[in-house]
Amino acid sequence: MKSITFNKQTKKAGILCMGTGVCRVCKVLYKYTMYNKNTYRREGMFEDKNWDAIFKKRLARHYDEMKWLYSELYHNDQQAFNYFCEMMYDYYEKRSPLLKEWDEAREASPDWYKGNDMLGMLMYTNCFAGNLKGVKKHLDYIQECGVNYLHLMPLLESPKDRSDGGYAVSDFRKVQPELGTMDDLAALADDCHTRGMCVCLDFVMNHTSEDHEWAKRAKAGEKEYQDRFFFYDDWTIPSEFEKTVPQVFPQTAPGNFSWCEEAGKVVMTTFWPYQWDLNYANPVVFNDMTADMLNLCNHGVDIIRLDATPYIWKEIGTPCRNLPQVHTLVRLMHMASEVVCPGTLLLGEVVMEPSKVVPYFGTIDKPECHMLYNVTTMASTWHTVATHDVRLLRHQMEAVFALPHQYTFLNYLRCHDDIGWGLDYEYLKQFGISEVPHKKYLNDYLRGLAFGSDARGELYNDDPRLGDARLCGTTASLCGIEAAEYEKNSWKLDRGIGLDIMLHAFLLTQSGIPVLYAGDEIGQLNDYTYHEDPIKAEDSRYLHRGDMNWDNAALRNVEGTRENRIFKALRQLEEIRAEYSVFESEADTWIIEPWNDHILAIGRYYNGEKLLAFFNFSENEQTAWVNEYEDYYDLLTGERKAAKAITMPGYSFLWLMTTFNKPFVKKQHPKLDRKPVENIVIEEVEPAKKPAAKKTTTRKAAAKKPAAKKAAEAKEPAAKKAAAKKPAAKKTTTRKTAAKKAAEVKETPVEAPAAAAPVEAPAPAAPAAPAETPKAE
C-alpha cells in the first residue's frame, strides 16, 4: 500500500480528483490502496465492502467518473451516492446465475448486437397475442420471420382509461394484469434466450401516471413526494416555463402544466394531464428509477428503450429539451448497467433532427446510448414515396454515411407511433419548397387525396392554426395495397406490393438493425375499428395498432396471396442480408449518382464484397445512368448483370454484387422456393483493387489499424466461441467473423447458382403513364 498526504476537509466535502491523484481544489494528493494488479482505489470507499469480486472490478472501472458526475449533478450528496452504489450491488446479487453467465459472454463479445443477422420486430403484446403467454406460444412464428430481437411495447401497469398506450405507468414493478405477471415476462425472456433472441422493453423515465404511488402521496400533501415532481403553489413559475417550453400536443393537451385539485397546486405535465413529469434534480428520483430499470433487467430484459429521453431534465428559461444534464443522467445509467448487467443495452428514443440525435451516442470513450432510432431517414423515406423525388433522402443518407461505424441505428418503416414531418426544410428551400404547404401536400398524398395516390392514412394531432399534422397508417395501406384490394384492381395490387417490398429492401440495405412492425411481414392493413372505441377514438395512432390477424397470417403459406408474396419476399431479402458480409455495419457506404432524381443508388463495400443497390421511387420505368466496369450478379436471381444504364420497372429495386480476390458464390436458402436459371456461368473475377466509385459521402474504416486492435481481432474467433457458451444449451446471437466467412468462401466450390424466386415486381396491365416530373404542392 502506498500512503501519501490526504486532505480530510476535501474528503468530507466529497470533492474528487478525477483519477489524477491530486485534488483539483486544494492540490493535495489522495491516499491510495493497491487493488489487484494495476487498479488503485481511494482508501475507505468500497474496497472494504464484502462485495463480489466481479462486481468490485466492474465498479472500479467506472467509479471515479460515476462519482464525479453524480456529485456534480447532486451537489456532493455523499449519502445519496452511497445509497446508489449499495442499490447497484443489491441488484447485482439478485441477478440470476444464468443472466450473469450471459453478461460474461456478452462482455467477451461487446459487439454482439451489431451483426448483419440481426432483425427486430416491434409489437403490442395484447394486439399480437393477447398476453405474454400468448406471445410465448407464438415464438415459433416470430422465429419463422427471422426475428432475433423482440421489442414488446409498454406492458407495465397503467390505468386502462388513461394509459396513453402504456406510457402512463402506475407501477414499474408490475405487468398489466390482463397481460400477465413479472414471472410471465421472465419466462418469455428465458424462452427467447434459449432461441437466441433478445428482448427489448420500454422504460418510461420522464413521467409517471397520476395513479403512481408517488403521485397519490403527493396529492395527499406529502412534501417528500411532491418534491419528486414539479409542484407550484400558483401559476407564476409555470407561466415562466411556458415562455420557452414548446407544447407537445397543442390541440389535444395544450400547455405543459395542469391544476391538481387534490393537492391544490400546479403540476408539470409535458405530455398528457395524467402524466406527471419526474424531477430528476432530486437524487431520490434518479436512484429509485434506476432501480426500477435494473429490476426489469433482472427479469431478462436485454434492451431498455429509454422513452422521451431528451425531456428528462427541466430548467426554467430553457426549452427543457436536450439539456446537458440529460446526457449526464444517461451516461450514469449506462455505467450502472455495465456494472450490474453488462449484457444490457440502452436504446434512446430521440425523435428529433439528426444534429440533436447523434450526441446521445456519447463518445467512444464515454458512451451513452448503445443504439438510437433513425427517425429522420424514416420520415424522409415517406416524403420520397409522396414526391417520387429522392434528393432529400439522398441528402439524409449522406449525413448518416458520414457518421462513425460505431454508431448503431435502429432502422424502420413504421412503428407504433405517427410519422412526424421533421424534415430538413433548410435543404428543401433550394427547390422552392416551404414547410407548411409541403407538410399539407405530404399528408394529402398519404391520405389518398392527391392525384394518383392510392395511400390510405389518417391525420394525427392536427393543428390547423399552424398548418401542422402528423400521419398514421400501416406500411401496406400507405403503399396502396388496401385501396387496390378494395377496388379489386390486380394491377394496383401488384404496384402496391412492389412498393412495399422495395421499401423493405431499402430498409435492409442500411447499416444498423432493421426492425419490422408486427403485421408488416404479411402486409397487414389499417384497423378502423378504433373509431368505435370511446377510449381510443380520439387517438388515430390506433389505426395501425390493430390486432394481429392470425387468419391472414396463415395465408403466408398460400401461394399467390398478398400475405404469401410479401412474407416470402421479405424472408428472401433477410436471409440474403444475413449471408453476405457486405451488409455488416463496418462496411463503407456511399451514395452513387444515377443522374435520375427518381432513383436512389447506394454503394457498400466490405471484406472483398461490393454491393450496388438501386431503388426506383417512381411508379414508372426509370433508368439509372451508371457505368460500372466490374462484372455484377443479381443477389436475388444469381444472374449476371452489367451495371451500365440500368432500366428499372416502377417501384422496383436491384441488389447487384461483385467480389474482389475471391469468386462470387451465390448462397443457397433452402427455405425459399427456387427456380433454376439456365445457361449461367460463374467466372472467377480477377483480383483487383477496390475501384474508386463515384460517391459524395463515404464511411471509411481506418487504413491502418492499431496493433492492439489487430491483436483483438486475432482473438475474435475465440471470443465469439466464449460468447456462444452458455448454460442449458442456450444460444447467443453473435456475428460471424470476417475470418470465418472468408474460410467458408474458400471451402465452398465455385458453381453455377440456383436462382432465387424473384421478388415480384408489378406487371402493369394498363399502359404506362408519361414520364413524371417532381410533383409540386
Locate the predicted segments by residue:
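Intrinsically disordered, low-complexity regions enriched in Ser/Pro/Gly/Gln/His and often acidic
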Residues: 12, 16-19, 44, 648, ...
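Intrinsically disordered, low-complexity, compositionally biased regions/tails
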Residues: 18, 23-28, 642, 755, ...
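Compositionally biased, intrinsically disordered low-complexity segments enriched
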Residues: 10-11, 32-34, 199, 718, ...
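Positively charged N-terminal leader segments that act as targeting/secretion signals
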Residues: 5-27, 31
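Intrinsically disordered, polybasic Lys/Arg-rich low-complexity tracts
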Residues: 674, 678-777
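Active-site and adjacent substrate-binding regions of carbohydrate-active enzymes
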Residues: 29-631, 635-689, 704
